Amino acid sequence: MSLASPVGALTRTKITACVSAANTAAATSAWTAAGAYEGEVAVEISVGIITGTLDLTFNTNDAASDTGATAIVPLGGALAQVTTANDDAIYTAVFPATALRGYIKVIGTVGTGPSLIAYTLIGRKKY
């Protein structure tokens, strides 16, 4: 595989560092700039061992603000709820870059924490 391959052209941006999230506030990311991407953009969700449940949803906005934000559903539909039966895994949510309004936010709703999680944005930049 050469560095000119499609995989070599991908950019990875850390949305959150690995965190033990005891509640929804701790499992929800800040707004991350996503306007410089083309094609499809993926959010990779790394989940360690959890003690309850974790529901993942996504918002997009044209500013890094909750005001005016709208929910966005990944291609293929919403992600399945993470439980103790399917934790310790990597999940991927894929979005058309054109559907993102410039920023993306991951909302992790924790039902009985903690949940060990990390989020990464992966895509090809336009420039």
Regions found by a protein language model. Name each.
Residues 1-127:
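Surface-exposed, low-hydrophobicity beta-strand/loop segments enriched in small/polar/acidic residues
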